[in-house]
């Protein structure tokens, strides 16, 4: 395993390996590469954040890579990988897992619902099976999916509202999920993302951190009550859970806005889908990002 890292994080990994606490406890030495041009890997897993992702991908040599996938938030990630490496090398993927990295470089593994990987055409392939086996064997739950685009959009439909509420309330996840006003905004954003996905021919499912298909199928009041009930479950099962967006805000790091909310809004504009709530939240989070750093 080789890790592409920069700055202080690269030094931490070089000196102490990858140190994980929480649901799993281990320290693993790994090879560190600081220059993307020096990376040589058969399978590339992208898990970085920041505005320079496109440039980094473009600087990674494509020839050794047979398969590339990204567990970043949002949907722009797939376009970036396809642009850099070609569609034949790219798999869909999403992470329904959580963690938090501390200043000393240690990572708290706090939620292990799973990582999903699949071919965009739904085919069952050997490369998907091999990657799933490697990840699952490491202790992180992983499984193949024949409807990966549906899962990716379903995750984003839930993530969008949770991200916005995390950086506006700065509260633990369960707290705003149980707030009726916050839950209403989450429901409204999920409905707009669902309309964008439908315009692309993608159907949402309930296989996500929030059951977005059910949220969009009933009345708004029913959906709000459902989100609030899930908030109570979060309070019991993951009381310390904080969105990575809130972690980034507290640490003074840039927020994931343009590849996530921004990308969805651009797709909505292109398709002629009305998204007033998403557009307003995009402006709000951009302002928070600019003024808090």
Describe each model-derived feature in a short phrase:
Residues 1-24:
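NAD(P)-binding Rossmann-fold cofactor-contacting core
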Residues 3, 32-33, 117:
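Generic preference for hydrophobic
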Residues 3-4, 46-47, 71, 146-147, ...:
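Active-site-adjacent beta-strand anchor residues
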Residues 8, 51, 76, 126, ...:
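Conserved active-site and cofactor/substrate-binding residues in soluble primary-metabolism enzymes
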Residues 10-13, 78, 265:
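Short alpha-helix immediately C-terminal to the canonical SAM-binding loop
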Residues 12, 63-64, 84-89, 108-211:
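Internal alpha-helical scaffold of NAD(P)-dependent oxidoreductase catalytic cores
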Residues 23-108:
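Rossmann-like NAD(P)(H) cofactor-binding subdomain of soluble oxidoreductases
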Residues 187, 191-293:
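NAD(P)-dependent Rossmann-like dehydrogenase/reductase catalytic/cofactor-binding core
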């Amino acid at each position: 395993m080789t890790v592409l890292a920069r700055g202080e994080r690269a030094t931490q990994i070089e000196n102490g390996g990858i140190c994980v606490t929480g649901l799993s406890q281990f320290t693993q030495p790994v090879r560190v590469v600081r220059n993307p041009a020096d990376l040589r890997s058969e399978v590339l897993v992208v898990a970085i954040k920041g505005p320079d992702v496109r440039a980094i991908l473009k600087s990674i040599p494509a020839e050794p890579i047979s398969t590339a996938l990204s567990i970043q938030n949002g949907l722009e990630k797939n376009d970036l990988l396809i642009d850099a490496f070609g569609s034949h090398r790219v798999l869909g993927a999403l992470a329904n897992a959580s963690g938090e990295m501390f200043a000393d470089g240690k990572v708290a593994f706090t939620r292990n619902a799973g990582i999903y990987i699949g071919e965009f055409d739904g085919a069952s392939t050997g490369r998907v099976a091999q990657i799933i086996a490697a990840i699952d064997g490491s202790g992180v739950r992983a499984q193949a999916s024949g409807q990966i685009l549906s899962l990716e959009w379903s995750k984003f439909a839930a993530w969008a509202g949770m991200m916005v509420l995390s950086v506006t309330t700065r509260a633990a996840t369960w707290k705003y999920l149980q707030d009726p006003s916050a839950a209403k905004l989450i429901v409204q954003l999920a409905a707009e993302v669902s309309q964008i996905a439908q315009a692309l021919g993608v159907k949402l499912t309930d296989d996500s951190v929030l059951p977005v298909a059910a949220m969009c199928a009933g009345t708004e009041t029913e959906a709000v009550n459902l989100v609030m009930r899930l908030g109570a479950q979060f309070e019991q099962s993951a009381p310390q859970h904080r969105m990575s967006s809130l972690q980034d805000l507290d640490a003074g790091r840039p927020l994931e806005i343009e590849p996530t909310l921004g990308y969805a809004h651009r797709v909505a504009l292109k398709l002629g889908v009305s998204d007033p709530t998403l557009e307003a939240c995009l402006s709000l989070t951009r302002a928070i990002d600019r003024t808090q750093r």
